[in-house]
């Protein structure tokens, strides 16, 4: 479509012999960086959609005052500023379109800690970040996804073809490359699921943990009384 540079290429097939969990276990076996998301209705009932994604195009991690972007080829970029503004700038580069029969699934997934609430609500006080090497925000941007439709019992593999720097003569090559990625995903899903050993639960096991409180007992008791 005109003005689009991140074109979704899809294939759909029956999901009779697969589940979202089995797919996640197969696709994430050699790449643990990914997401497995389930939609939920009313906070209780399992929803219609499940999304499995591995091998992010790039990852972004906030540490201290920096946000580090790491591409899937190992190249890194270091930026400073508001992480949300930076993420908006990065994602604006990708102009895509909705996919028929699929919800607006997005491609940027991640999590962030309390330290970033100040970027949204400046009046909320936060403590100065002490550990500069501990991430307080982490995101992954995907150009390939697997989407389960629990009602129609079908799987849709999505690969986004980047046409931003291509000429018309190379569009066929990009399309075939996207189809090849989908086929690799399907081949991985055909592999039998390996056996997993479950951990034995021992409720009587005693662990010797070296714990040290960062509160004095007196201060803790006073805080409890104040909360009451």
Please describe what each predicted stretch is.
Residues 80:
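Active-site metal-coordination/substrate-binding segment of hydrolases
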């Amino acid at each position: 479509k005109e003005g689009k540079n991140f074109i979704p290429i899809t294939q759909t097939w029956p999901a009779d012999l697969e589940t979202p969990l089995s797919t996640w276990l197969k696709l994430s076996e050699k790449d643990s960086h990914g997401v497995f998301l389930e939609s939920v209705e009313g906070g209780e009932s399992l929803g219609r959609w499940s999304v499995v994604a591995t091998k992010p195009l790039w990852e972004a991690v906030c540490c201290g005052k920096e946000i580090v972007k790491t591409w899937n080829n190992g190249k890194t970029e270091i930026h400073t500023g508001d992480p949300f503004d930076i993420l908006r700038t990065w994602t604006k580069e990708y102009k895509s379109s909705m996919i028929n029969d699929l919800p607006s699934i997005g491609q940027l997934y991640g999590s962030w800690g309390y330290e970033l609430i100040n970027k949204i609500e400046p009046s909320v006080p936060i403590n100065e970040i002490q550990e500069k090497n501990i991430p307080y925000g982490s995101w992954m941007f995907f150009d390939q996804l697997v989407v389960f439709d629990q009602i129609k019992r079908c799987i849709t593999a999505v690969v986004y073809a980047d046409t931003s720097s291509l000429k018309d003569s190379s569009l066929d090559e990009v399309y075939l490359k996207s189809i090849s990625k989908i086929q690799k995903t399907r081949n991985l899903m055909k592999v039998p699921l390996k056996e997993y050993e479950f951990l034995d639960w021992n409720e009587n096991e005693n662990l010797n943990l070296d714990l040290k409180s960062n509160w004095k007992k007196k201060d803790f008791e006073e805080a409890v009384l104040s909360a009451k």
